[in-house]
A protein has these predicted regions:
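Conserved hydrophobic/aromatic residues on the N-lobe beta-strands of protein kinase domains
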Residues: 1, 48-51
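ATP-binding glycine-rich loop module of kinase domains
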Residues: 1-29
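Residue-level recognition of conserved beta-strand positions in structured domain cores
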Residues: 4-6, 42, 52-53, 111-112
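Conserved protein kinase catalytic core
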Residues: 9-10, 58, 98, 117
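Short helix/strand-bridging catalytic loops that position acidic/His residues to coordinate divalent metals
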Residues: 11-15, 63-68, 122-130
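Conserved kinase catalytic-core helix
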Residues: 24-37, 52, 57-102, 106-110, ...
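Short beta-strand micro-motifs within the conserved protein kinase catalytic domain, predominantly
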Residues: 38-49
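C-lobe/activation-segment region of protein kinase-like
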Residues: 102-186
Length: 186
């Protein structure tokens, strides 16, 4: 798979595109060898990521077709725990397009451009922000469980999912507006 920013406008390509490629490359290097994440083959000119193609379908499509395998969400939770142990947080798992049901029925997490590394948030108050993003990743798994197999949601996960603070709601609204703006600029 190729993620290419060369076709974007000059400013977006050279400011946003290069930054996103740099961030995503950093994430893939941290994830190297972790089953359930694509392999980064190379970066071209700081604007193109060449990634492993993983056959399968998005979680959204699999859910619509009723083909989410039994045990998928347990495996997804284990994958999320595995990349958290490596000190990386995805930060955009709420988008179903970023989760792939592989041809083997296993979860794969794609699009690491929004990811953050624990070491980038190692000083107070940034440590609290990083912990919040960890919870966000876990809440994404709970969101999909609620949608596709609600009987598998634990009480602890449900309480965590429903316990959003006013600050989190405000940050989410700001993030969504920023995403819309960036999509218009691209």
């Amino acid at each position: 798979m190729v993620k290419d920013f060369r076709a974007n406008g000059f400013l977006f390509r050279n400011l946003i595109g290069r930054f996103l490629v740099w961030r995503e490359e950093k994430a893939y290097r941290r994830l190297k060898g972790l089953k359930g994440t694509p392999t980064l083959y190379r970066v071209v000119d700081g604007l193109v990521l060449v990634l492993e193609h993983i056959p399968g379908m998005s979680l959204e499509d699999a859910g619509d077709k009723g083909t989410v395998p039994e045990g998928f969400f347990d495996a997804l939770k284990m994958l999320v725990d595995a990349f958290h142990r490596r000190g990386i947080c995805h930060c955009d798992l709420k988008r179903a397009a970023n989760i792939l049901v592989g041809a083997d029925g296993r979860p794969n997490v794609l699009d690491w451009s929004a990811a953050i590394l624990e070491r980038e948030f190692r000083f107070f108050p940034l440590t609290g922000i990083y912990r919040r993003f960890l919870i966000d990743d876990l809440n994404a798994v709970t969101k999909y469980r609620l949608r596709h197999s609600p009987e598998t949601v634990s009480v602890e996960a449900l309480e965590r999912y429903l316990g959003r603070s006013r600050l989190e709601k405000m940050i989410r609204a700001l993030r969504d507006r920023l995403r819309e703006l960036l999509q218009r600029v691209a």
